[in-house]
Structure formats: structure tokens, C-alpha cells
Amino acid sequence: MLNIEKVKITTLSENSVADIDYIAEWGLSIHISIEGHQPILFDTGYRHACIYNARVAGIRLSEIDKIVLSHGHADHTGGLRSVLEVIKYENPNRKHIDIICHPAAIESQHVKHTDHYFYRGCPYYIDELTRLGARFKISSEPTWITEDILSSGEVPMKTDFESVAPICYLKKGNQYVNSTVEDDQALFILTNKGLIIILGCAHRGIINTVLYAREITKIEDVYMVIG
């Protein structure tokens, strides 16, 4: 387990800021730095805030080892292209960066308002991102990022008081199919003080996610839940 003092978590994009030097936007991006390991980026925000804020904070995105996507909605994947471009610019010799996500994260995701469907998935073609060095590692199962960091994969729906908003849909062919946001996942960091659980939107429920974290890590103590 990691010593908690070796873990540094920096929010690079969120819908509010605590300092006028930074900018806010819809969505989320979190930089995770652990002593002795290359950093990890959890989500990329909606547009460019994570890039701007990383520069203000003195964080070099080219040092990121992997990008983990909490799910496919645009406010978490919209910064992908810009992040990959910055990595390529800062380190032209780098060939690939792994992007870890659920299979549904790259499907055609929509939301329904009144009688209309609006696209809310990743705003880029997968081929477009792979040309910039993205190497997709796609799985619905838990995936070890390091020996102490685990992506949850698909979170089981166990509680009877948490549910997915009925406005989420996947477009399959010409049909819109109701989605339970199966791609929603979290990061679990195993530390000497307990689990740090990093959420995206937690579409499948915060409590469901915490219960699953305890189940697959066999650690009962939860030190922190953020996201």
C-alpha cells in the first residue's frame, strides 16, 4: 500500500476555482502524482481548462503515463485531443499513451430532453486520437494501473436507492437505446490510511462505487472520496 504522504491529487478542470489564476469549465480532470511513479490523468475536462491550469500549476502533461476515462461523456473526454497534442509537442519522440476506458465509453452517447436526442459522447473519432498517439486499453473489468491504483471497470448496481438518470441513451444504428451508463468507473488508490476513491460523475451511484471498491480491494477503510 502507498504511504499517503506520497500521493498528490490536483484538480485541473472543474466547474469552479479557488484561485483567480485558474479557469473553470464544465467537466472534470484530475492529475494524480505518486512518488516513484509517472503521473496519471483521470479525465480531460470539456475543452482546454486542464491544459491551461496544468501550465499555471507547473505540471507537464507530457510526463503522464496513462489517461483513465471515468466514462464517455463530453465533459470528461472533450479535452482528449488537446492533451494528446500537448504531449506530442512537449515530447515529440513519444509514440503512445495508454487510454484506459470501458467499451461503452467510445460508443455514440446521447441524452434525451423532451422529444429530442443530443449527442454528448466523445467529440472525436477514435482514429483521430490514435493518430495523435492514443493507444486504447478497453475493458469492462477492473484494471491495475500500478500495483496500488486500480480502475474499477463496470460498477455493479446493488443499492435500491441509487439509479441512473433515464435521460441517457446509446445510439445503435438508427435506434436510441436507454443506457445505464455501464462505462461509468472510478479509480481506487490503496494507501496506508485506507482507500482513496476518485469519482467521475458516479452515474451508477456513489454508494455502489464505494461498496464495489471495498469488495474488489478487500479493504474496508475508506480514507477519502473525491471527484
Cite the ranges covered by each PLM segment.
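Conserved beta-strand hairpin/beta-sheet module of binuclear metal-dependent hydrolase folds
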Residues: 6-57, 180-199
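Active-site metal-binding loops of divalent metal-dependent hydrolases
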Residues: 14-15, 44-47, 72, 103-105, ...
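Pre-active-site segment of Zn-dependent metallo-hydrolases
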Residues: 22-23, 35-66, 81-82, 88-90, ...
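Active-site environment of divalent metal-dependent phosphoester hydrolases
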Residues: 49, 74-77, 106-108, 143-144, ...
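Short acidic low-complexity segments
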Residues: 60, 136-145
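Active-site HxH/HxHxD metal-binding segment of metal-dependent hydrolases
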Residues: 65-140, 153-164
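Cap/insert and terminal regions of metallo-dependent hydrolase folds
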Residues: 66, 73-79, 97-98, 177-186, ...
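Active-site-proximal loop/helix segment associated with metal-binding centers of metalloenzymes
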Residues: 113-119, 141-192
